[in-house]
Every structure is written in structure tokens, then in C-alpha cells.
Amino acid sequence: VQGTLSPAEIIERTAQHVRALLPGDSAHDWWHVERVRRNALAIGAAESADVHVVELGALVHDIADWKFHDGNDALGPSRAAQWLSELGEKPEVIEHVRTIVTEVSFKGAHVETPASTLESRVVQDADRLDAIGAIGIARAFAYGGHAGRAMYDPDIPPQPHASFEDYKKNSGPTINHFHEKLLLLKDRMQTAAGRRIAAERHEYMLAFLERFHAEWNGKC
């Protein structure tokens, strides 16, 4: 198909491909990708980003998530690039999307995850917005159940992971995940729109945690 598909056709083929590939975990399913795509397009437009690159990056950002491939974080960028190459996408677009997929993931509380291009910053923010707020709470418990994690254990404190390897090995209770990742995301947003949306979603999570602990302790 090299050289025969329009940008719109490449987007549509990629959406179909990703939808067929994604795992059964409802926290990382097609609807997660679709929400990230919508967020990314809105943020990208506000930031005057290349929306074709942004949309492709959002669509393939979880094409081979390390959480479902034995911790292999090189597989996603490789598969994204291979797929786009098969569609005849421009080499410079392929490399840009590969960079987005490489940079998108959170890798631990004490691990820097800089995004090297505007489009990468847009997709990273869009993905992180889907990890916080009401949707983020639902996704956290959906994945925790999928992974067989405890909901909460007051005897197991949160762990401030110092490396990506430590973060990959984490199997702590879902409530800990709020302190290990979700509550950190507000201050790591890299676009104006991302920061604005994250601030409200962050407050929602704080209110949820306050209520959760009150109910856990029989205070309401």
C-alpha cells in the first residue's frame, strides 16, 4: 500500500488495527485510546501542534503496552513504527510517532519522563488526563482487579519508585497507586490545557480518597 493511502485513510486503518489488537483489560482498552485521542486532538489544536502526528501518536500509544508484554518497553515503539511503515506513512512521521510512544509512559515517582516535541507533550498529557479524575479512579480499580491486587491494605505503605524497573515490579494495593502515580500527574502536565483540566480532576481524586478512608475507618 506504500504511497497509496491518504492521511485520513492511514488514521482510519490505524484505528481499526489498534481496536483489534488491544487486551481484555478494560483500563487499557479501545475506549481508553479513544478518550486519549479526543483529549489529544483538543489539546493539540489549542497548542497549534501537528494534529496528524498527534492523532497517530494517540492511537498507537498503547499498541504494545509493557504491562502486557513482560515489561518490554521497546516493543510498543517498534510495533507502531512497523505498522505505519506498512501503510506507507512518511519516514519523518513514523519517527516522530515512535518518539511519542517511547516517551508517553509514566515510569516512577522519581523518574523524569521528558517529552522532546510539542506533539509528544500533547499525547503524554492526554494519556495522563485519562489516568486521573473519575475515569482515572475507575481505571485504577479496573486494572487492580485485573492484576489481582488488593484494593487497600493499611499495612502496606506506598512506594516512591526510584527507577522504571522498580515501578514495573510494583504489585501494591490500588489505593497506593494514587500516591505512587495519580496524585503526582497534575504537576507533571506540560501544556496549558493539560494543566487546567488536571487541576480539577486532581481535586476530585482528593475528595474520593478522603471519603474512601472515612468509610474504611467507619467514620461515615
Label every model-predicted segment.
Residues 36, 72-86:
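An active-site-proximal "capping" alpha-helix that borders the catalytic cofactor pocket
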Residues 51-69, 76, 97-107:
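His-Asp-centered metal-binding catalytic motifs of divalent-metal-dependent phosphohydrolases/nucleases
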Residues 69-73, 134-135:
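Conserved strand-to-helix beginnings and helix N-cap segments that scaffold or border functional pockets
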Residues 2-5, 9, 21-47, 60, ...:
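Divalent metal-dependent phosphate-bond-processing catalytic cores, especially two-metal-ion Mg2+/Mn2+ enzymes
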Residues 87-124:
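Hydrophobic, well-structured mid-protein blocks that either form specific transmembrane helices
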